[in-house]
C-alpha cells in the first residue's frame, strides 16, 4: 500500500521540487532545439537513461564482483560483470575496470598504478590539445608528478614523433601519455610504443575522445600497443558520463583495481555501471558502427566547408587542413572574430560549440582563437551527408562578417524539427 510511505517519497519531481523539474524541462528543450556540436558531448539512448535513473542508485557495493564489503550485492554483481565482460570483448582486452566515476578519476587511478609521485611523465602540451590530467600544473597530475610535455609542429600542427622521441630521450619519463582532448588526427601508437620501450617507460593511452571510433573499427586501437588504456564512456561511445580502464596486461590488474578502489574511490555508482554495460552492448551493433561512420564523415564535410575559399577569405581555417576523427578545430587567428565571439554567434543561430585555444594561441585561454566543433551528437540524432553539409554551410556563413543570424537560425530550426530528440519524454519547455 502506497499510503505506508511518506507522500514526498511517492510524489513526482514536479510535485516535490518544481524548480528542479523546470530546469530539467528547460534543458530538454535546449537539447531538442539546438544543434549540439561540443565534441565531448553526445546523446545517450533511452535505455541508458533508464539505467541511470533506476533503483540501482540505492545500492552500496564497495569492492568488486564476488568480493564486496556489503551484503545484498548479488544482482549488482551481475550488472558489473556484464559491463566488465562487454568492455573486454569490445576492445580486445584481457582486463577491464568499469568503476571509475569519470575519465579524470580513471586517469588518476592509472597514474597512481604505474608511477610514483615525483616521477616524470610525458604528455601532450595542454595548449596544443592535451588534457588537464596529462600533466597540467594545477591538476593532480602536474602537482604529484614531474610533468613535461611534447607539442605539435608549428607549421603542420601535427604531433612530430621525432620530437616526441627527443623529449623522451632528454627526460627519461616513467610514463609516456598518448591521447588528447583537442587534436584532429590519429596518433601513431606503434611509434609511441617503440619510444616507450627505448626509454623504459610505460605507455598509457587516453582514448576518451575516440573510443567509439575504435569500437567501430574506424580508428586504430591503442590496446595492442599500450600498457594501459583509459577512457570516458560519454563522448563518441555515447554512454553515461563515467570512465573505465582496459589493458592486455593482466599483471597490472591488481594494481589498477586497488588504485581505483580503495585508492581513488569508495562505493561504485551501480546505476551508472549498469548503464555502461548497456552502452558497451550497443557499441557492438551495426547501427553503432554506422553512426560512427557518419560521425567521421560529418566532421570531414565540415572541415571541407571551412577550408573553402570564402571561409578562408573571411579569416577562418582548419588546423591540420582536415580531420580523421569526430572533431574539427577551426582556426580564427586571422578572423575578425575571436573564439568567444564565434561561440556566441553560433549559439545565437542555434549551434552549441566551445571556444578552444589553438597551438601557439596569441589570445588568452578564456577568449582563444579557435573553436572545437564535434559531430557525435548530430550523428546520434540521425544526421547524414545531406544534413551535415547543411550544418557546415550554416557554420561557415555564421562566421563571416555581417551574417544573417535570423535566417541561419531558421535553417537550424528546420533541422531540429526534422530530427526530433527524445520524442517519448515530456514536451519541450521552449
UniProtKB/Swiss-Prot annotation:
InterPro entries in the record: PyrdxlP-dep_Trfase (IPR015424), PyrdxlP-dep_Trfase_major (IPR015421), PyrdxlP-dep_Trfase_small (IPR015422), Ser_HO-MeTrfase (IPR001085), Ser_HO-MeTrfase-like (IPR049943), Ser_HO-MeTrfase_PLP_BS (IPR019798), SHMT-like_dom (IPR039429)
Keyword set, alphabetical order: Amino-acid biosynthesis, Cytoplasm, One-carbon metabolism, Pyridoxal phosphate, Transferase
Site keyed Plays an important role in substrate specificity: positions: 234
N6-(pyridoxal phosphate)lysine modification, residue list: 235
Catalytic activity: (6R)-5,10-methylene-5,6,7,8-tetrahydrofolate + glycine + H2O = (6S)-5,6,7,8-tetrahydrofolate + L-serine
First-tier enzyme category under EC: transferase
Binding site for (6S)-5,6,7,8-tetrahydrofolate: 126, 130-132
Example of a GO MF term: glycine hydroxymethyltransferase activity
Main location: cytoplasm
Family label: Belongs to the SHMT family.
UniProt name for this protein: Serine hydroxymethyltransferase
Protein's organism: Leifsonia xyli subsp. xyli (strain CTCB07)
Organism lineage: Bacteria, Bacillati, Actinomycetota, Actinomycetes, Micrococcales
